């Protein structure tokens, strides 16, 4: 009985945390709030490879190197120079899959930079990135962190950086619960801390690809022998500021 009550309490606390992130302004998010949006939410998911028992929690996951912090502060003119932070080393390799075209993801990036000490005037410049209109596109990003196996990390990064963009179109797509898909339009290899970018059309047959009743959105990609990602996002949880964000 105690175990059941404890489990129920955890579920309630998690639900309350998610609700708080959606109701309070992003400018008031804590580091943990922003980290959860980036890595464990309707817009950001984590796929692990290896021993996930050493996976960093929300608190340790937002730590970053001094060099990374200084780099992000210096490059205020580029929206891409925003990061969620380097994670503490672990055995597992973590693929962070995020819907960059969703406002909460962009807001979380900028909020973390603000919390980490960027000058107010720089943060003000970055806020334009939060409100950016992605128009007719859905953009998914992938970043990697967490592994002490530098060889493995290097192999994966090389695969992501050198993948044939045209060949990738045959193995990369977004899929709804009903099985309908949109294929990859464009691939951009990682050139900044936002990671590799996968660009998809926002419409299918003249209608928005995602609607409130779509159930779920699945991102799938496969490249070479080392990269295979498949993550699902719950559409019912994508409402933010009265709008379906994806």
What do the PLM-derived regions correspond to, one by one?
Residues 7-16:
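Bacterial N-terminal signal peptides
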């Amino acid at each position: 009985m105690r175990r059941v009550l404890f489990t129920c309490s955890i579920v309630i606390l998690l639900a309350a945390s998610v609700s708080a992130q959606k109701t309070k302004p992003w400018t008031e998010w804590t580091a943990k709030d922003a980290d959860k949006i980036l890595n464990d939410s309707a817009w950001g998911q984590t796929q692990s490879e290896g021993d996930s028992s050493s996976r960093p929690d929300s608190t340790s996951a937002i730590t970053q190197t001094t060099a990374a912090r200084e780099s992000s502060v210096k490059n205020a003119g580029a929206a891409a120079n925003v990061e969620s932070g380097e994670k503490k080393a672990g055995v597992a390799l973590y693929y962070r899959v995020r819907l960059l075209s969703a406002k909460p993801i962009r807001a979380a990036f900028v909020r973390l930079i603000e919390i980490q000490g960027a000058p107010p005037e720089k943060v003000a410049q970055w806020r334009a990135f939060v409100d950016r209109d992605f128009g007719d596109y859905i953009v998914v990003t992938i970043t990697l962190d967490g592994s002490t196996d530098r060889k493995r990390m290097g192999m994966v990064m090389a695969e992501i950086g050198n993948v044939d963009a045209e060949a990738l179109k045959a193995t990369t797509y977004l899929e709804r619960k009903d099985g309908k898909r949109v294929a990859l339009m464009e691939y951009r290899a990682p050139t900044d801390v936002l990671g590799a970018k996968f660009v998809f059309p926002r419409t299918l047959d003249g209608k928005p690809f995602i609607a409130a009743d779509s159930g779920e959105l699945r991102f799938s990609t496969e490249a070479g022998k080392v990269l295979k990602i498949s993550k699902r996002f719950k559409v019912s949880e994508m409402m933010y500021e009265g709008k379906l964000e994806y």
